[in-house]
């Protein structure tokens, strides 16, 4: 009985940890994470007032927003640190269209308490697949042995919205809004946005912009833009309940073909099913 209870506890912790990892990979790429769980829906709040920025700077950033949005996809390399809870690296390609986010990332845990939890199950990295309606995470063999041999955990966004406490709802909204040009949209609402200057970023001439967004839960957003009005680099800094949040992302190969296949149904466990089994 004790062994069964311990197994259930581990499974529950991992299901939550994997959700946190999926959030962390993209946490800095849009305004959604800055909302509290109890706040009104994000899109209404963002459209209730006009952008704070006007003039030549606004025109320049809107050109970046349009160009990045039209590109539709890019290769991504990112590092994320969330206080003492989690640090990770992610590499892959993501696409953004009207129907949402798609793509595949390889996520490597590099530190923090969440990483320690995953390492205890023999998992130091995972594959994450983002589809318009769901997020999938591939675990290792040791975890699969605990859940009937299935390696993939499935998180349907609509189901996440029903989670208690509001955390799932924030994740679902974030996944639908996660694109590089969301950072530009955020800067267009910043009152202190400024052009820092011209810099070389990964061997390319770029223009550096910086500003503070998010109101009471302010984050600093910095972007570096090339001569095609495409983001080359983005850095976001702020605070979370677990400490300082810092994410650095690099973008390249805009327009790259992106695909993400659904894992085999027989090798996939729905997160709701896994959580429900904890009370059985």
What role is predicted for each listed range?
Residues 2-102, 272-280:
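N-terminal leader/targeting segments and the immediate start of mature chains
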Residues 69-73, 98-100, 123, 130, ...:
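Extracytoplasmic
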Residues 70-77, 99-104, 115, 202-210, ...:
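Short, hydrophobic/aromatic-rich segments at coil-to-beta transitions
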Residues 78-80, 106-109, 139-141, 235-240:
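Beta-turn initiation residues at beta-strand->coil junctions
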Residues 89-137:
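N-terminal beta-strand/beta-hairpin edge segment
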Residues 132, 136-178:
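Acidic/charged, solvent-exposed loop-and-adjacent secondary-structure segments enriched in E/D, K/R, S/T
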Residues 185-194:
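A short, amphipathic edge element
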Residues 198, 204-266:
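Gly/Pro-enriched, hydrophobic low-complexity segments
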């Amino acid at each position: 009985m004790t062994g069964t209870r311990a197994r259930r506890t581990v499974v529950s912790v991992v299901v939550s940890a994997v959700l946190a990892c999926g959030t962390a990979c993209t946490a800095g790429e849009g305004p959604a994470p800055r909302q509290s769980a109890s706040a009104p829906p994000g899109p209404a709040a963002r459209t209730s007032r006009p952008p704070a920025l006007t003039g030549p700077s606004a025109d320049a950033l809107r050109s970046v927003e349009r160009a990045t949005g039209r590109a539709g996809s890019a290769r991504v390399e990112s590092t994320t640190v969330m206080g003492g809870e989690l640090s990770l690296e992610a590499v892959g390609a993501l696409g953004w269209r009207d129907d949402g986010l798609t793509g595949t990332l390889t996520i490597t845990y590099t530190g923090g308490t969440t990483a320690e939890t995953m390492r205890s199950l023999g998992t130091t990295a995972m594959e994450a697949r983002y589809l318009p309606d769901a997020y999938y995470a591939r675990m290792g063999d040791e975890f699969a042995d605990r859940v009937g041999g299935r390696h993939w955990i499935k998180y349907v966004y609509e189901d996440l919205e029903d989670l208690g406490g509001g955390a799932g709802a924030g994740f679902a909204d974030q996944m639908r809004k996660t694109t590089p040009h969301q950072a530009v949209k955020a800067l267009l609402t910043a009152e202190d946005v400024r052009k820092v200057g011209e810099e070389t970023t990964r061997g390319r001439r770029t223009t550096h912009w910086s500003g503070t967004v998010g109101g009471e839960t302010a984050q600093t957003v910095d972007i570096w833009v090339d001569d095609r009005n495409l983001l080359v680099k983005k850095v976001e800094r702020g605070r979370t309940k677990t400490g300082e949040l810092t994410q650095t992302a690099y973008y390249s190969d805009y327009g790259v073909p992106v695909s993400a296949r659904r894992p085999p149904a027989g090798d996939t466990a729905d997160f709701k099913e896994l959580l429900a089994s904890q009370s059985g």
